[in-house]
UniProtKB/Swiss-Prot annotation:
Family: Belongs to the THEP1 NTPase family.
GO molecular function, one term: ribonucleoside triphosphate phosphatase activity
Biological role stated in the UniProt entry: Has nucleotide phosphatase activity towards ATP, GTP, CTP, TTP and UTP. May hydrolyze nucleoside diphosphates with lower efficiency.
Organism: Aeropyrum pernix (strain ATCC 700893 / DSM 11879 / JCM 9820 / NBRC 100138 / K1)
InterPro entries, A to Z: Nuc-triphosphatase_THEP1, P-loop_NTPase
This protein's UniProt keywords: ATP-binding, Hydrolase, Nucleotide-binding
Hydrolase among keywords: yes
Official protein name in the record: Nucleoside-triphosphatase THEP1
Pfam families: NTPase_1 (PF03266)
Keyword Hydrolase: yes
Amino acid sequence: MQSRELREQLLGCVKSRKSLHVTGPPGSGKSTFVSRLAEALRVKGCRLGGFMAPEVRRGGRRVAFKIVDIASGEEGYLAVADESLAAPGGRRARHGRYLVLVDEAWRVMSHAIRNAFEHADIIIVDEIGPMELAVPGFREALTEILDSGKPLVTVFHRRLRTLDPGLYKLLERGCIVWLDERNRGPLIRLVSEIASALSNEACGNS
C-alpha cells in the first residue's frame, strides 16, 4: 500500500469513528507504533486505558511477557518461560514453552479494562494473541469493548483469523492495517497526524 493510500485509510478510519487494529509478522514494529501513538495521545490530553504486554528479556533471551495497565501502571506476568518467575498458586495454562499465569494476568487485565470503560477516552489493547486468549474472561471483555463503540486501538496476532474466526469478524468492523517492513516507516511517520485526528474525535478535553 502506498503512503498516500495508507494515510487516507487511517485518517478515514479515525474520522468515521471506527476502531483501528494493527497486525503483521513478529518484529514488524506493531507495538512500537502503538506505544508512540499512545505517547502522542497523552501529550494531547487524551485519557487512555487498557493494557500492553511487553516482553521480559534476561541475558538477551526472552523469558516472559508482562501485562501492564496503561493508566495505573499496575503489572503482572502474562506468561513465563522460566517457572521460577511465577508466584506459587493460581491457575495456569501451557502455551508452547510458556506457562500462562491465568489468575495473575486476569487480575491486571480486568482492572485495566474496567477502568478503561469507565474513565478512558480511548482504549488500547496490545495485544490480542493466543496467550491473552488463554485467559478466561478476556475474550468476553474484548467483545464487550468492540460492541460498545468506544474508540479502540489494538495489536493482534497475525494468525487470529484462523485462531478465532468469530473474534476476527468483530475486528473487521473496524479498520485492519497490515504492518511490515515496507510500510513501517510511513506508518510511524503518520503517528502525529493519527493522534491529532483521534484526539479531535474521541477526547473531550482536546
